[in-house]
């Protein structure tokens, strides 16, 4: 073993010496990339040593809160995610949850545990003990309720009224995500099965089987009543059989009620999980996806995923199980009236066939109605959000005419289908009535007894109901196609979250753009054309150029909103395409050109990217953004409500609140796209001086060139290429494109 260790040590020393070779002109970005390679290289040799020697490296979590990490691992195991070791630099609870849960798409939110919270279970919960503040995982167990691992006893304990007081009221609830790849019917079915517990399936199957077994008594009792009891003229026997039949009816009603409650619980469980997973998937989709659909249209399409899951549950558990078990009633038809079996089955099959033909014929109209409904929802939402613009232009009547045209088409499809579909119910009634007349005739000809006919009629009704349930399954299946097509854009688009992509823990602020080219559509010219740029940590860089030169597009590429067709972008030597984008964006403060505030109070708007920040930290960010005095003058200060359209505040206040939001988490990189266009020179100077104190990398896009005089570098773009690069004074002295742009602005002013 000592020989193996020595050989591995030599290899590691060689790799380090190899990394210490003089790098000449290469800057810090190349050094960082080399360091990343060396870390991976060293880890590979350490893994070989572990495999050969049978040892295990000491955990990087030494000194961390073992209980907290252990609780998070138990939650990961519950969601069938393999736990991984945490870097020593990840120390806070928020950072640990981000590092471990984010790459797997697991969602979380803060909740309050009210009295009796343990009686039902939806997802795993992370809580804390009152005595020592240590973290504890609450894991769903059985048909309802939670269990937790007691470190003292070393056993899993069920939470109940006696021990719920041991835990703090504040906790974090977690939700299971959809698979991170493309969603299919199979993956949705697997998601539903994994969301439900074994007890959910067992209880539903048992209750359905019990309801069917009780139902089998109906034909038997009818035969006994109309035969033996009536022939005997025994009053006591009549009373006894009557009481028994009433008891059977009540039992059947109770069992079906229990089944309905179980199904309602399952549907609620599925609905909560699916809605949370759908929202998380929508929020995780690439930015360019949202260009294709309006907000209302996308909202409607997201709801169809929930509809699809409800259909799957109904087919598999509710209608499906009932239909299968109810087929046992066929044996009773053979028992009481063999001569009527085939005519009865013929009528049932004819009704079933007619129902299926009608359903599949209606599919294309259902799809059309869904599409029109989604389109109408999108237009309605756009009209409501843009009502101020509509009124300013006096276009109320024109907008109503556009909406009513779309709505009328939707009504036309819904209320004026072909004659065959409109007369569907009448045709079905004719088939059923004709079948009953035929069976009455055959019963008379076959001389079926009264008692046997009553029993047959009861069994026939149950068999007919079973086949109609099968028809309803076919109807539901027929609706799968239009429903899937409506939800297909969300299901097919792969989220930005990808399992295995590393979470960004820290940023130094170094950025490298290497030979990047980008166009929005094939066949169009490049907006960014073979652009290369290196930005050192802490640099203050301005990007300028005429309208359409690619400034905002470059910013979108840096944020991962667009993917380059060629080249790569690196942060601290790490390729943007290979890292978790959300964790990167959380380390960057951004104010986009058309940025908006969210509906809510000012405090919520400032801390939205860092919910753990306190009110004092929000005030500090507002001071740096030069908006604190304005907030103090507002009716409720930091808790003043802002409407969706940012009503009640000026454009300058809106921009400064967005700047406060960007700088509140103290990011290492700040990107501003025309973020101070509505500010006067004095306020802009306050903001600029405050940003200087952050000691972070700043990338600014500005049309007002007087605001970038203090920049370390100014990049002039033209047709997606860098044509000039230097300080303000250097570019003015060159007398090139930038100097011409400055001169034009002076003349305009």
Give the residues covered by each predicted segment.
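Helix-loop-helix
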Residues: 230-247, 329-349, 416-486, 490-491
């Amino acid at each position: 073993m000592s020989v193996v260790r020595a050989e591995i040590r030599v290899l590691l020393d060689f790799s380090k010496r190899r990394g210490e070779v003089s790098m000449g002109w290469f800057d810090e970005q190349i050094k960082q990339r080399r360091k990343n390679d060396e870390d991976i290289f060293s880890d590979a040799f350490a893994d070989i040593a572990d495999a050969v020697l049978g040892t295990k490296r000491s955990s990087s979590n030494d000194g961390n809160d073992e209980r907290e990490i252990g609780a998070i691992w138990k939650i990961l195991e519950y969601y069938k995610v393999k736990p991984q070791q945490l870097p020593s630099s990840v120390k806070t609870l928020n950072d640990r949850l981000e590092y471990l849960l984010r790459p797997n798409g697991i969602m979380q939110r803060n909740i309050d545990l009210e009295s009796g919270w343990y009686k039902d279970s939806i997802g795993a919960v992370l809580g804390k003990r009152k005595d020592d503040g240590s973290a504890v995982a609450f894991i769903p167990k059985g048909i309802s309720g939670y269990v937790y691992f007691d470190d003292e006893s070393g056993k899993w304990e069920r939470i109940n009224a006696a021990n719920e007081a041991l835990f703090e009221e504040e906790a974090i609830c977690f939700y299971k995500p959809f698979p991170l790849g493309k969603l299919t019917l199979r993956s949705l079915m697997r998601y539903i099965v994994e969301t439900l517990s074994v007890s959910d399936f067992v209880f539903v199957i048992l209750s359905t089987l019990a309801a069917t077994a009780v139902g089998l008594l109906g034909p038997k009792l009818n035969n006994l009543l109309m035969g033996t009891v009536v022939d005997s003229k025994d009053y006591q026997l009549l009373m006894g059989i009557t009481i028994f039949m009433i008891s059977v009816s009540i039992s059947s009603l109770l069992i079906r009620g229990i089944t309905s409650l179980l199904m309602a619980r399952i549907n609620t469980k599925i609905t909560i999980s699916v809605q949370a997973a759908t929202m998380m998937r929508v929020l995780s989709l690439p930015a360019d996806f949202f260009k294709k659909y309006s907000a209302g249209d996308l909202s409607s399409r997201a709801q169809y995923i929930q509809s699809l899951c409800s259909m799957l549950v109904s087919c598999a558990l509710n209608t499906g199980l009932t239909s299968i078990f109810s087929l046992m009633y066929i044996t009773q038809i053979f028992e009481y009236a063999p001569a009527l079996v085939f005519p009865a089955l013929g009528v049932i099959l004819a009704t079933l066939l007619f129902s299926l033909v009608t359903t599949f014929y209606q599919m294309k109209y259902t799809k059309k109605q869904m599409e029109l409904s989604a389109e109408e929802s999108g237009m309605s939402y756009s009209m409501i959000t843009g009502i101020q613009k509509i009124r300013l232009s006096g276009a109320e009547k024109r907008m109503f005419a556009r909406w009513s045209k779309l709505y009328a088409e939707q009504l036309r499809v819904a209320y004026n289908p072909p004659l065959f579909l409109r007369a569907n119910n009448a045709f079905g009634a004719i088939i059923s009535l004709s079948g009953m007349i035929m069976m009455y005739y055959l019963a008379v000809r076959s001389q079926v007894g009264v008692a046997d006919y009553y029993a047959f009629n009861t069994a026939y009704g149950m068999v007919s109901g079973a086949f109609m349930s099968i028809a309803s399954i076919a109807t539901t299946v027929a609706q799968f196609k239009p429903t899937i097509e409506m939800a297909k854009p969300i299901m097919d688009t792969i989220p930005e979250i990808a399992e295995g992509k590393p979470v960004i823990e820290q940023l130094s602020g170094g950025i490298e753009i290497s030979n990047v080219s980008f166009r929005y559509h094939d066949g169009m010219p490049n907006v960014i054309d073979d652009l290369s740029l290196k930005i050192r940590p802490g640099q203050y860089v301005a990007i300028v150029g005429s309208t359409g030169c690619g400034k905002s597009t470059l910013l979108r590429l840096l944020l991962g909103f667009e993917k380059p067709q060629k080249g790569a972008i690196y942060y601290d030597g790490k390729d943007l395409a290979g890292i978790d984008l959300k964790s990167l964006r959380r380390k960057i403060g951004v104010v986009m050109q058309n940025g908006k505030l969210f509906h809510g109070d000012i405090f919520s708007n400032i801390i939205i990217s860092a919910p753990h920040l306190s009110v004092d930290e929000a005030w500090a960010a507002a001071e740096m953004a030069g908006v604190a005095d304005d907030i103090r003058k507002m009716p409720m200060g930091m808790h003043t409500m802002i409407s969706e359209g940012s009503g009640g505040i000026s454009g300058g206040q809106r921009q400064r609140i967005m700047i406060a939001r960007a700088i509140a988490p103290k990011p290492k990189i700040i990107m501003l796209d025309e973020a101070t266009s509505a500010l006067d020179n004095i306020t802009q100077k306050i903001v600029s001086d405050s940003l200087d104190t952050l000691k972070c990398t700043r990338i600014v896009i500005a049309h007002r060139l007087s605001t970038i005089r203090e920049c370390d570098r100014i990049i002039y773009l033209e047709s997606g290429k860098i044509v000039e690069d230097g300080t303000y004074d250097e570019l003015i002295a060159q007398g090139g494109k930038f100097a011409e742009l400055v001169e034009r602005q002076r003349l305009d002013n």
